[in-house]
Amino acid sequence: RNYLGDRDYFKELAADKADRLVVSPPVLGRLTKKWSIQVARAIQRDGRFDGVVSIAVSPEEWAKQLASFEAGPRDTLTLVDARGHVLLRTLDGASHFGKQAPQKREYILHPEQREGHYVAHASVDGVLRVYGWTRLRNPELVMLSGIALEDALAPVREMSHRMRLRAVVSAVLFT
């Protein structure tokens, strides 16, 4: 047997009478010694809490699936809960478990907003990215897509450099 009564998702469901799905931040399994995200719902019997039913999802495997959508080597997809806890991240995933997004982010401050965007240096790796975010059907979850600006602008910078070089060569040849 595995005791779950001290897990946050279990406590949250035990204390709440509403019938809802809870997605936990990554937890380290006591038996498996592997990270998992628990997707859980309370079992109610005669209107009283009687336990939980849950499924463990591997954040590493989930992140691998999401990584197939990335365009650049430093672009990232990140799933956070409503409080900004990182559930999974496609870059360096396991090193971000338990970390939290800055509390000034719109998706934390304004739970009524469904989507948005911003430009920021990532708090976890310092890379400047433009982020788009959307609240999923479960309003407790937010998916962020971050595109590394330096990488995204590299082709434009290269073209600009070539155009300046052509202008200099043209000026030298035709003057």
Kindly label every feature range from the protein language model.
Residues 4-9, 51-53, 97-101, 130, ...:
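Charged, low-complexity, helix/coiled-coil-prone segments
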Residues 39, 110, 169-170:
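Alpha-helix boundary/capping detector
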